[in-house]
């Protein structure tokens, strides 16, 4: 539930992802942010937007992407900011949120879009010419779908969606393409590839709260898990089971389809012929365990790929994880 905020927002940490989709937009956003928020003390890290701010912290030394990202986050939160602003895509915001939650840190977040898709929900502003004033921002509590190992070790949070598949969307030469998820997660390599016909191995099983779910689709092209807490599908029967979610504890949904939904590849299914899919709703406390996924299938959380140990994963819905600021 949104409400007017009286929280102080004087000390604002900024992280800009130079590798996100719309790199040229980031300098414009940083300039607009400083002009729009003159009352805030903005600071950042060199190489991550900080060099364009008056208060700049030293950047990380050479290392893997996530190692450098962690260094940047540590530097930013050490000053105990009132707000963390991400400039980039949904993946940048999700990495930052996941980093905070893994450490039980609570810092309100505000996302400015300069990435591939900028779907949200952390990234809520996409126009650098129309950034809201600080007093126009209100806080909102946000949940996520969490992916864990079967024995309960955290893997990732999906605030918009958590996809099980072998590909993820990204940008190359200004074009949206599908990259191999495993290559990016395990090696940091960007290789364009096609979606697997099925993400389920020969011994694939699904189990909700200890009960085995029968396989009803001829194959599993992709699985998408997402919260629906931001949506209101009341009475919209065309959305399937989602029309039952408003006003109930069931605020997350799992959708399994015979073809990949999140892809650049074209298919006549659903446009010229029927597409088959199945839905399952989740409430807090539910546990969906998937075993026997095909080799190199990953969890892709808001565009960020994660390796699944042993080809198994546990999915659950966690409400009220994060405070996000949005335009009133």
Locations of the language-model features?
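ATP/NTP phosphate-donor binding region
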Residues: 1-83, 94, 131-133, 139, ...
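ATP/nucleoside-binding phosphotransfer catalytic cores, i.e., glycine-rich phosphate-binding loops
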Residues: 8-16, 21, 25, 47, ...
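Short glycine/serine/threonine-rich phosphate/pyrophosphate-binding segments
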Residues: 22-24, 91-97, 118-120
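Short Gly/Thr/Asp-enriched flexible loops that form oxyanion-binding sites at enzyme active sites
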Residues: 74, 83, 89-106
């Amino acid at each position: 539930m949104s409400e007017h905020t009286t929280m102080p927002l004087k000390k604002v940490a900024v992280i800009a992802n130079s590798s996100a989709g719309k790199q040229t937009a980031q300098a414009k956003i940083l300039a607009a942010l400083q002009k729009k928020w003159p009352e805030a003390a903005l600071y950042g890290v060199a190489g991550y937007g900080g060099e364009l701010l008056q208060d700049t912290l030293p950047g990380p030394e050479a290392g893997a992407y996530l190692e450098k990202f962690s260094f940047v986050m540590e530097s930013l939160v050490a000053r105990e900011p009132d707000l963390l602003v991400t400039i980039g895509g949904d993946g940048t915001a999700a990495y930052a949120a996941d980093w905070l939650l893994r450490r039980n840190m609570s810092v309100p977040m505000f996302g400015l879009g300069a990435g591939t898709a900028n779907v949200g929900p952390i990234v809520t502003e996409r126009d650098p010419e129309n950034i809201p004033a600080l007093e126009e921002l209100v806080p909102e509590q946000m949940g996520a779908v969490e992916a864990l190992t079967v024995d309960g070790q955290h893997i990732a949070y999906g605030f918009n969606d958590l996809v099980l598949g072998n590909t993820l969307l990204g940008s190359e030469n200004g074009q949206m393409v599908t990259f191999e998820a495993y290559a990016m997660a395990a090696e940091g390599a960007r290789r364009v590839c096609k979606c697997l016909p099925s993400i389920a191995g020969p011994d694939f099983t699904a189990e909700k709260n200890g009960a085995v779910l029968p396989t009803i689709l001829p194959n599993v092209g992709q699985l998408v898990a997402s919260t629906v807490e931001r949506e209101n599908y009341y009475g919209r029967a065309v959305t399937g089971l989602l029309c039952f979610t408003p006003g109930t504890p069931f605020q997350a949904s799992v959708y399994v389809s015979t073809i990949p939904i999140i892809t650049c590849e074209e298919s006549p299914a659903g446009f010229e012929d029927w597409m088959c899919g199945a839905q399952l709703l989740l409430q807090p406390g539910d546990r969906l365990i998937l075993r026997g996924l095909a080799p190199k299938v990953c969890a892709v959380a808001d565009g960020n790929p994660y390796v699944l140990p042993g080809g198994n994963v546990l999915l659950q819905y966690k409400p009220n994880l994060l405070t996000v600021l949005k335009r009133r």
